[in-house]
Amino acid sequence: TRDGRILPLLQTVSEVRDSHGVLTHHIAVMTDISSIKETQSRLDFLAHHDVLTELPNRLLFSDRLHHVIERAQREGHTIALLFIDLDHFKNINDSLGHQVGDQLLIEVAQRLRSLVRRSDTLARLGGDEFVVLMENHASHATAAGLADKVVAAFKQSFLVNGIDLFIGCSIGITVYPEDGADAVTLLKNADTAMYRAKDAGRDGHVRYNAELSEATRSKIELDHALRAAVRDGG
């Protein structure tokens, strides 16, 4: 274009022949397909990002996590995961409505963006669950340092529709390869640690260890036993 922009064009070439079937010339038609390309790019973005916050979604995050683990395995370095779950978000959603809840999630995403490093991946897994992937030889110390910053940042209110909302968060931390050698295990164990942070009083962070999984398994078995006892007794 005259202003230096490059436009994607679709070229269609047709043959023109005379009455004897002899090719005499060609006709080329150029069509601007910028809008089509923009639509395709937008659809691709929406397939891999959360519509509300525009953060990477679970699909894109899982793909990145797999690749980062493969690279960490080859190069022999560590990575860390922070599994972040908002405390009492459902209360706000139920009392003030989903519109306020959605806007709060947008504000939370923006605050988290301001805290993570450029090399980190921040994603929304769904609902009020966020996760941070820390690369480049991340350790428990660096992960705990970021978790402390997140918890401290959530001490400040979130302004939504003229209302100051206070909400905390519980964070579970895992480090590869010590706390999981694959993406599924690493994320599952971070989730387990997050729930322990909630059990410990919320508004804090917990590092995963094997005892947490055993405690979680025992709790599930106890819940099943209690449900069975109630069912059989009824």
Predicted regions and their residues:
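PAS-family sensory domains
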Residues: 1-4, 17-18, 22-32
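Sensory-domain boundary capping and coupling elements
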Residues: 11-13, 30, 168
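Cyclic nucleotide signaling catalytic output domains
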Residues: 122, 149, 153, 159, ...
